[in-house]
Amino acid sequence: MKRRFLVEFRLQGAACNGFTYDVSPSGIFVRSARLPTPGTFLTAKLHLPEGKRIEVRGRVIRSFRVSAALSRLIPSGFSIRLSDSPEEYYQLFMAS
């Protein structure tokens, strides 16, 4: 499901952010200039409508950067396979 939420995460101690490009009950694709290495375990905070924030955790399974020429067609970013998500996350899919 295509949904755009602000995503905050940390890489090597640095605060980073991106936006969801695609979300599903089992994972998230995040568009971001900062790309974690596949295999990295990541905690991310999603900013939902009405000021709600939820924290999800998972392992990065894919990470890639496209050339500037393709960036309007194909997003650079990474995929997280979720392993720990609150009930509020799953409610996003029941509402749609």
Predicted regions and their residues:
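Structured alpha-helical
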Residues: 1-96
